């Protein structure tokens, strides 16, 4: 059973890393429909999935193991970002990687702590509140670090990004609820993963 648990742990961490790398790539592209190019990038649609992964990890394994998944996902995500989507001659690409790493780590660890404090409330309280607060912190840290002083209208982009993240956080309650019963049914052992 421990091997299955370890496998699930690494699947969660790798999924987190993929979400981060994909989002870091997509944030470079504004949504060019319905006059949204000054308000929104495609990264806003994929990044909130990281909070779903963190919250499922926290619910299944607890706070300490969820933090391990965040750290491993962070490390892999930064590596993938630098490898696939960073143009080393472009300062903005490097700032995106640094901004993403800083915002991701800060927001996800805050999400883990808030979720843990609210875990005994009604089922949707912990994932919703922790994701909303984490998304807000992530958005403003990321956009200010990545785009401040570049001439890109990062404040407007950050508000558009946050609006979509709030919407996606609400919709992520559906898969969270669906996966919640599966996670609780399959977590009969309480042994911690030693990674």
Region spans (language model):
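Membrane-embedded alpha-helical hairpins and interfacial helices in multi-pass inner-membrane proteins
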Residues: 94-192
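Membrane-helix exit/interface motif
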Residues: 53-57, 82-90, 109-114
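Membrane-interface helix termini and inter-helical loops of multi-pass transporters
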Residues: 28-37, 87-92, 150-157
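Cytoplasmic-side transmembrane-helix entry/capping segments in multi-pass membrane proteins
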Residues: 9-13, 64-75, 122-129
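Hydrophobic transmembrane alpha-helices
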Residues: 1-64
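Helix-adjacent hinge/juxtasegments
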Residues: 76-104
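Structural signal for membrane-spanning alpha-helices in multi-pass inner-membrane proteins
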Residues: 20-28, 80-88, 142, 146, ...
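Small-residue-rich segments of transmembrane alpha-helices in multi-pass membrane proteins
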Residues: 16-20, 47, 72-81, 102-103, ...
